[in-house]
Structure formats: C-alpha cells, structure tokens
Amino acid sequence: MKKDDIRRTVRARKSLLTENEKAEAAQSVFDRLEQMAAFMMADRILMYHSLPDELSTRDFLGKWSGRKHFFLPRVNGVNLDILPYEQTRLHLGAFEIEEPDGNDLTDIADIELIIVPAVAYDRHGNRVGRGKGYYDRMLAGSRATKVGVGYDFQLIDDAIDTDSHDVPVDIVITQSHTVIRRR
Ligand SMILES: Nc1nc2c(c(=O)[nH]1)N(C=O)[C@@H](CNc1ccc(C(=O)N[C@@H](CCC(=O)O)C(=O)O)cc1)CN2
Ligand SMILES: Nc1ncnc2c1ncn2[C@@H]1O[C@H](COP(=O)(O)OP(=O)(O)OP(=O)(O)O)[C@@H](O)[C@H]1O
C-alpha cells in the first residue's frame, strides 16, 4: 500500500475518535508498555511529546518522569536533536510541537529505548511517518529497542511499501495488539 494513501485513510479514521476513546487507547497502550521487559530494563528513553492527532503521551510522561530519564526530540533543520525532558522547560517549537529548551544535547547512541511516533505501522514493523524522514535519519544511528505506538487502525494488515532508508520498529503496541518483529 502506498504511503500517501495510508496517510489519508488514517487521518480520516482519527477525525472520528471521541475524547473518551483517545484517552482509553492511550491508557491501554502505555499500561502494556510499562509491563514489557524492554521498558522496565531501560533507563534512558526517547519519548515524543504528542500532537493533538497522536496517541497522547502526556499522562505517561508525567507518571514516569521521576523514575526514568526521558528525552524528547527537537527539530534542527533536517535533523532531530535529543534533549532531556523537564516539564518546566518546554517551548512550542517547529510544527507546533512542545520541545525542550537549552543546549544539553544527548547522543542518540546513549538512548536505550525509543518510542517512535508514526502515522501507521505494518506487522513487520515498517512505518509511515509524516513524510519528512526525521525519524529515519535519526534511527539510522541507533541500536536502541524501537517501539511504535498507536490506535488499532494505525496497525495495518497490508504491507507498507518501504524505501531503502526506512528503519523498522521492533515492537508495535496498539489497544488490542502487541506485535513483535521477527528478526
Ligand atoms: N509528537 C511528535 N514529535 C515529533 C515528530 C512527530 O511525528 N510527532 N516528528 C516526526 O518526524 C518530528 C517532527 N516532524 C514533523 C514533521 C511534519 C509535521 C507536520 O505537521 N506536517 C504536516 C504538514 C505541514 C508542513 O509540511 O509544514 C502534516 O503532517 O500535515 C510535524 C512534525 C520530531 N518530533
Ligand atoms: N537516512 C536518510 N538519509 C537521507 N535522507 C533520508 C533518510 N531517511 C529518509 N530520508 C528522506 O526523507 C524523506 C521522507 O522519507 P519517508 O517518506 O520515508 O519519511 P517518513 O518515514 O514518513 O518520515 P519519518 O521518518 O519522519 O517518520 C525522503 O525524501 C527520504 O529520501
């Protein structure tokens, strides 16, 4: 399935979600992430600060920020910088995303677990992002466990057409499914 068709279909499905459904899905997905060894064992975790149309990470960030070292991406040209998450030091950055202030840049190689946002995933861990390649470029330099999260309809049955630069995730978690990529 072509990436642009997937982006259109997922956008339409998202627009039908109620606030209640959004909250329930986020709770269920992050409850399961918490119980996974990959999360329990990891201390340095790259999260994302959710946009309104993404599975919300707000509650989860708040719940665990005292016990894990969370990091967030910050757009820097065509690349993503990685900085520590501190609730008091966020500003609205590129694309209206809340991003960390300061210059405490962290090496991607020091991150143990990455929660990777996407428009959709297939059962092989392939992903469709927002089409700017930010995560693909960053993930190319990482050996961390990569976890995709989303609503049920963001896990699609058809295989996604991949390009050579696409980096798959190891695990996809949705409300009803946990998919582990075969290696
Ligand atoms: N929460 C969150 N943070 C993230 C990402 C993400 O997908 N989600 N990113 C993942 O890469 C990076 C930012 N990349 C982004 C790329 C495009 C758009 C976006 O809104 N695109 C519009 C098109 C508008 C335009 O071209 O200016 C769109 O999708 O409709 C947002 C973020 C880093 N931080
Ligand atoms: N490692 C890379 N090096 C150079 N260019 C890249 C790399 N990865 C992706 N790109 C470029 O980024 C653009 C978008 O790629 P693609 O459509 O796969 O993004 P995406 O997976 O939807 O986005 P994202 O990775 O931000 O979630 C393409 O033009 C691609 O050539």
Q: Where do the PLM segments sit?
A:
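N-terminal active-site beta-alpha-beta segment that forms phosphate/nucleotide-binding
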Residues: M1-A109
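Short polar/charged helix/loop
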Residues: G131
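Conserved residues at the C-terminal ends of beta-strands
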Residues: Y48, P117, Q175
